[in-house]
Swiss-Prot record:
Family, as annotated: Belongs to the UPF0261 family.
Name recorded for this polypeptide: UPF0261 protein BB3289
Coiled-coil blocks: none
InterPro entries reported for this sequence: Tobamovirus_resist_UPF0261 (IPR051353), UPF0261 (IPR008322), UPF0261_C (IPR056778), UPF0261_N (IPR044122)
Length: 402
């Protein structure tokens, strides 16, 4: 079969960003790369783009009329979906470059997020100097701040856009080069600072046989790992640090989404999980902790991070929440119960040590997980950071991944 020539897809709302898009197209063509320009404007006006807004909008499940509504908010949401579906249908996407303000960024980045990790994605945006998590999510999108508004060419915007063109062209070429692969299958492992010793022991034990990909459990970390599982890129998962559930249920700043564990259920990938750092909810600096939580047991982890100890009632709730999702998993699942504590702070003499709270978590798991030959809870009578726990996790993983 003849190899399909890859191209850089350049997406912009041509009714407001056409001048900048054409400037980028010229730079990329001068650099010798093939470019496909795509108009994602919701105004319905004509443009010189190679792919018209009408063609993109037609990819919406309800047709172009769902996009060209005349109402900005709903039109952006609809065009974002249409562009995501359009891009997913193209077989020659070698990289994606987008430019835009808040609307254009919200419109282009969902399609970028849907692409596999490793396909270069660069968004030049007025929003890139703030909180970019809603745009980047679990993907490898690179965000470049436009400095000036994306509203015409000037000496600043020309330089920034020229740098963007050079960056995406370089990434496009590099992505086509083979990278070293020693043949070891990849496993995903979740970690937090307070479960680091556990993960270090696990990765040391697995290193010879597996390429260990460690994800920081910051909300997007878990999403990134599950995105790889959904993409079939992981041979197994050791989800030892499920702390993102605390933040999701109790208002922390490092929350997962409601789809946590969803990729495990969908993919059936061999899964070893545990209760790492389910004793804490993450907030920012101490003065950012919600007023309703100020009288709780708080621990300043550093000047930027304040931790709140979960209660027995909260632990029972999150144990039931996790159990309900584990029950959806039909692949091989082992969920380990570290009876000696779930984090470095949850140990004798440490700030969050609370046997009753931990017992409520463990009991909720026992009460709600429907255990089968393929889905089992495993008692481990030691602390999560004890080398014996890591050994148990590795043994369970080897058992289910043979």
């Amino acid at each position: 079969m003849q190899e399909i020539e890859q191209r850089i897809y350049l997406a912009a709302t041509y009714d407001t960003k056409g001048e900048e898009a054409e400037y980028l197209r010229q730079l990329l063509r001068r650099d010798g790369v093939m470019v496909v320009t795509v108009d994602v404007a919701t105004s319905g006006q004509g443009s010189p783009a190679m792919v018209s807004a009408q063609e993109v909008a037609a990819c919406h499940p309800q047709g172009a009329q769902a996009v060209f509504t005349g109402e900005r908010g709903s039109a952006i949401v609809a065009m974002a979906l249409a562009f995501e579906r359009y891009l997913a249908g193209q077989r020659d996407v070698g990289a994606v470059l987008g430019i835009g303000g808040s609307g254009g960024t919200a419109l282009v980045t969902p399609a970028m997020r849907a692409l596999p990790v490793g396909v270069p994605k660069l968004m030049v945006s007025t929003m890139a100097s703030g909180n970019v998590a809603p745009y980047v999510g679990p993907s490898d999108i690179a965000m470049m701040y436009s400095v000036t508004d994306v509203a015409g060419l000037n000496r600043i915007s020309r330089r920034v856009l020229a740098n963007a063109a050079g960056a995406i062209a370089g990434a496009f070429r590099q992505a086509r080069q083979p990278i070293a692969d020693d043949g070891r299958p990849a496993v995903g492992i979740t970690m937090f600072g307070v479960t680091t010793p556990c993960v270090q022991h696990v990765t040391a034990a697995l290193h010879d046989r597996y390429d260990c990909l460690v994800f920081h459990a910051t909300g997007t970390g878990g999403q990134s790992m599950e995105k790889l599982a959904d993409s079939g890129l992981l041979a197994g998962v050791l989800d030892l640090t499920t702390t993102e559930v605390c933040d999701f249920l109790f208002g922390g700043v490092l929350a997962c989404t409601d789809d946590r564990f969803g990729a495990i259920a969908r993919s059936g990938v061999p899964y070893v999980g545990s209760c790492g750092a389910l004793d804490m909810v993450n907030f920012g600096a101490l003065d950012t902790v919600p007023a309703a939580c100020r009288e709780r047991l708080l621990y300043p982890h550093n000047p930027q991070v304040t931790l709140m100890r979960t209660t027995a009632q909260e632990n029972a709730r999150q144990g039931a929440w996790i159990a309900e999702r584990l029950n959806r998993c039909e692949g091989q699942v082992r969920f380990l119960i570290p009876e000696g504590g779930v984090s470095a702070l949850d140990a004798p003499g440490q700030a969050f040590y609370d046997e009753a709270a931990d017992a409520a978590l463990f009991q909720a798991l026992y009460d709600h997980v429907r255990q089968t030959d393929r889905r089992r809870l495993v008692r481990v009578p030691c602390h999560i950071n004890d080398p014996l726990f890591a050994r148990a996790a590795v043994e369970q993983f080897h058992e289910i991944s043979q």
